[in-house]
Amino acid sequence: MTFIIHFKDGHREIYSNRYDEDVEHERDAAWDDVYATFPNADYIEEF
């Protein structure tokens, strides 16, 4: 899955992981992964 990570200072990053977005428990794991990787993110959106 791919996410756009927004930070409070205005910059953004794209982050991808290898979870299958069509499988619910993998989609949940992908979100857990991105939140753990970017704990200081202001906003995270799925791309």
Predicted regions, residues:
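A short beta-strand micro-motif
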Residues: 1-8
